[in-house]
């Protein structure tokens, strides 16, 4: 049936039904929630059930477990995650029925079409920076729409449809899909060698993609670039758009001075253009989070948020799910306890930043790390860097690599990584086959007063939650 667009331009009534294949993915749930709030009939499928899919169901989405051709019948558009294979039965059925298929980033670009877009790109720190920008703009009364890759703890969600004109999103460089976006403001936090498999194992192609990302800005657009990152600093010199820099670097336009850490809090002086200076308290540990806060401050200043309001937003920001989440003290037996921190970090540079934050906040505690490597290709490409940073902790437990759909690569598994760490002569890592075994193994490694970091982008976060709710397992299982 051929449908006519309504004279009043109400496209929602003309094409109301949107189906998401892989709806439980971090990049998909936020778009689905915004479209639900806009009035679309949203359905979706995923092989796994999680907090995000259950939330969407309570909001009115129809969520199916597993993939079936029948799931797309009657839908007007199919949105697909980059993790979905071309032979997925729902995609095949959509093609046979001539239903439009849109990649996730293309649908995000459609949402941006009707608002002023702020896109946050970078290998690390995107989620935290995007969340901080949303918090600053919200505190400033701009009521932005935001779509974030992690759960904003204050909102209990990773997306919100605001009444204001600004849309704040993460721009995913991992597969080059950020080049579909046409923002008004582009933030680049850092550029690192990750997801090389999508760039022909050529780091220069990643850097070229970021250059092209900035070229997608209109001539009146703005690039906000972190001067502390050498690759981004180089990009700043080549950008053919209006540029504003931020960083702890003394030459940055928006910068932090007198940076001090006390436990999980950072204190610094925020120096804005035109001589504006305010003291800031940030409830996120680590210098990397100071940089994230500076990016949000720069955006807020550009959009007219008063400096004192920026400071208030940063102080009240409570964080994002799985970004240095302090889960409190957990018992390890005999009346002893350890402090448990859950974190999404899965790249050597992220591990290094989190370790520095942990040592800066708790210098007297022994640092024990349970790490689940993510992807065999990343473990292979960053093998030496992983071995170097992981050998710096006081005690280490490695689980097997979370494959994320990849097949094993010889020499890029947990045992090989443990051998490389052991060869450095600084630590004796323990290797477990399944991540769930951490519940049984960790009590034998931990000591009273330790700081335990559980890190990785796979399913190790669910194990941290099990430990909080059910405790460790002692003795025979």
Swiss-Prot record:
Pfam families: Mur_ligase, Mur_ligase_C, Mur_ligase_M. It comes from the Bacteria. The keyword RNA-binding does not apply. It is found in: Cytoplasm. ATP binds at residues 122-128. Pathway: Cell wall biogenesis; peptidoglycan biosynthesis. GO terms for molecular function: ATP binding; UDP-N-acetylmuramate-L-alanine ligase activity. Its EC number is 6.3.2.8. Belongs to the MurCDEF family. NCBIfam families: murC (TIGR01082). This is UDP-N-acetylmuramate--L-alanine ligase. It comes from Xylella fastidiosa (strain M12).
């Amino acid at each position: 049936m051929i449908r006519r667009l309504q004279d009043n331009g109400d496209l929602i009534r003309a094409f109301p039904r949107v189906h998401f294949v892989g709806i439980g993915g971090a990049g998909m749930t936020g778009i689905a929630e915004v479209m639900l709030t806009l009035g679309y009939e949203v359905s979706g499928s995923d092989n796994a059930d999680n907090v995000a899919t259950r939330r969407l169901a309570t909001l009115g989405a129809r969520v199916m477990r597993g993939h079936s051709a029948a799931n797309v019948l009657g839908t007007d558009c199919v949105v697909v995650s980059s993790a979905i294979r071309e032979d997925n039965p729902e995609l095949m059925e959509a093609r046979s029925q001539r239903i439009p298929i849109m990649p996730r980033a293309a649908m995000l670009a459609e949402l941006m079409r009707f608002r002023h877009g702020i896109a946050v790109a970078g290998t690390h720190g995107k989620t935290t920076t995007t969340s901080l920008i949303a918090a600053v703009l919200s505190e400033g009364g701009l009521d932005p729409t935001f779509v974030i890759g992690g759960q904003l703890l204050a909102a209990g969600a990773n997306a919100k449809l605001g009444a204001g004109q600004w849309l704040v999103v993460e721009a995913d460089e991992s597969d080059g899909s950020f080049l579909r976006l046409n923002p008004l403001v582009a933030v680049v936090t850092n550029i690192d060698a990750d997801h090389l498999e999508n760039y022909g194992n050529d780091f220069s192609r990643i850097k070229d993609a970021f250059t092209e990302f900035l070229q997608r800005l209109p001539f009146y657009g703005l690039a906000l670039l972190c001067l502390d990152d050498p690759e981004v600093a180089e990009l700043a010199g080549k950008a053919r758009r209006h540029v504003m820099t931020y960083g702890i670097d003394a030459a940055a336009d928006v910068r932090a001075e007198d940076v001090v850490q006390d436990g999980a809090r950072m204190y610094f002086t925020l120096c804005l253009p035109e001589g504006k200076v305010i003291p800031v308290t940030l409830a996120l540990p680590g210098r990397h989070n100071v940089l994230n806060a500076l990016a949000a401050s720069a955006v807020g200043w550009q959009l007219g948020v008063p400096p004192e309001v920026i400071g208030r937003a940063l102080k009240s920001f409570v964080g994002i799910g799985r970004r240095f989440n302090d889960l409190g003290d957990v018992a390890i037996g005999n009346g002893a306890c350890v402090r448990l921190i859950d974190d999404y970090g899965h790249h050597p540079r992220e591990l290094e930043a989190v370790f520095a934050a942990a040592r800066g906040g708790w210098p007297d505690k022994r640092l024990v790390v349970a790490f689940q490597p993510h992807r065999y290709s990343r473990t292979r490409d960053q093998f030496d860097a992983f071995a170097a940073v992981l050998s710096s902790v006081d005690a280490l437990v490695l689980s097997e690599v979370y494959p994320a759909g990849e097949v094993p690569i010889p020499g890029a598994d947990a045992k090989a990584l443990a051998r490389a760490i052991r060869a450095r002569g600084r630590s004796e890592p323990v290797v477990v086959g399944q991540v769930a075994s951490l519940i049984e193994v960790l009590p034998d490694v931990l000591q009273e007063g330790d700081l335990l970091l559980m890190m990785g982008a796979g399913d190790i976060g669910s194990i941290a939650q099990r430990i909080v709710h059910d405790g460790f397992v002692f003795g025979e299982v």
